[in-house]
Every structure is written in C-alpha cells, then in structure tokens.
C-alpha cells in the first residue's frame, strides 16, 4: 500500500496551552481534563485530539469508581493505575459511553489511544483474548462515533485487523526513553531500536499509514532535542 502523507503532530499534556507554539502543527494531542474545549479560536487550522488511555485507568478519572473489581487485571506500579481486562464483554460499551462519549460531546473528533499493550503487565493473561477485546473496543468506537479519527500508540498487532479504522500509529522511545521508576532519561538499546524500526516500517509499507515517533529528552538539553 502507498504510504499516506504524515501530518505534523505535537503532544502537549500541560494545563496552559501555549497557542502560539502550535501554529505549525496540523494536530495537537492534549490531555482533555486540562482543556475546556476541543478547539481554539487562535488556531483555526489545528485539530485537537484527546489523549485517552485504553487499558489503564487512573483513580482520578471520573469513571474509575464505576469499574467493577472483576475487570481489573493488574496494577501499573510506576503510574499507580489499574490495568483493565480487555476480554470483558461489557468493556467496549463502557469505554465508548463513559470514556469517549463525553469527549465527543465536547467536540473532539480525534483521539490518541494510549496503553494498548498494558495487559502484558499482568502475571497471567491470554494474548489472543486481550487483542480480540481491543479490536472490539475499536470497532465499538467506529460504530458509535462515525468519522472518528484514531491515532494508536503502538498496538502494532492490532492494525492489520482493523483496516480503515486507524489514521496513524505512534511509538514512544525510538532513541531516547523516560524511565518512570528511576525518574531518568535513558538511551534506547540498539536491539530495541531495530525491533521498533521494523514495526514502524511494516505500518508504513504494509498498512500504508503514517507513523509518529515520540522520544524523551530533558527540557534543558536543547542540543539533543534538535539532533
């Protein structure tokens, strides 16, 4: 398949959106709990996408208290979040109605889907059942919200199962990573980098989708940021 043209994308999870910094971007991914609206008059040509965690839920989210304990598969100790069992039959509808629908009502039409592989944090899990559950989640979103645009953060194995339902695939830490446990920026090992490059090439060449790479650099390290 021919590779689609890649839009310019920025990710910003801060509370104060510096509009002038984002005029060069087609898409800005933001934390919707920090932003009152899905559009900014100062940026008429920029689309705002909402960051949404799929398999992990923080206790601070409004819908957290309504998630049954039986749906909780594991805990991410680094971020203090609960990992949700994607094989639960009622989860796709819950995710669509409780997580995405309120954001859709606020005007968001694009979503950055994070934590698509966090089920692997569990001690035991059925890989196929978890992936099938995630496919049902994505299909539920397209059925419930016609025209929805989705950027995957990883989820490489899911993309071939969802033709026409993914707009772009992102991946963190091609060259540099952030270690939440040690609170340090680290260089990615060459073996991991080559594996990730292979995944991204497949997405571009096999699926014809644009890719987005997110690397982590200390804010004061301007030279490395520009490298």
Language-model regions, residue ranges each:
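Glycan-processing catalytic domains of CAZymes
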Residues: 2-227
């Amino acid at each position: 398949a021919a590779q689609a043209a890649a839009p310019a994308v920025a990710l910003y999870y801060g509370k104060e959106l510096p509009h002038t910094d984002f005029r060069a971007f087609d898409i800005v991914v933001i934390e919707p709990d920090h932003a009152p609206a899905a559009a900014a008059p100062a940026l008429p040509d920029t689309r705002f996408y909402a960051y949404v965690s799929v398999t992990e839920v923080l206790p601070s989210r409004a819908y957290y208290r309504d998630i049954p304990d039986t749906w909780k598969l594991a805990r991410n100790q680094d971020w203090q979040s609960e990992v949700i069992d994607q094989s639960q039959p009622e989860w796709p509808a819950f995710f669509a109605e409780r997580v995405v629908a309120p954001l859709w009502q606020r005007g968001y039409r694009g979503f950055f889907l994070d934590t698509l592989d966090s089920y692997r944090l569990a001690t035991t899990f059925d890989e196929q059942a978890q992936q099938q559950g995630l496919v049902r989640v994505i299909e539920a979103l397209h059925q419930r919200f016609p025209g929805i645009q989705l950027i995957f953060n990883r989820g490489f194995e899911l993309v071939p199962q969802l033709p026409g339902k993914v707009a772009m695939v992102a991946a963190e830490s091609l060259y540099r990573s952030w270690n939440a446990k040690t609170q340090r920026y680290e260089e990615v090992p060459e073996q991991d980098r080559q594996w990730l490059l292979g995944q991204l090439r497949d997405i571009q060449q096999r699926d014809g989708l644009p890719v987005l790479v997110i690397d982590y650099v200390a804010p004061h390290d301007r030279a490395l940021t520009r490298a």
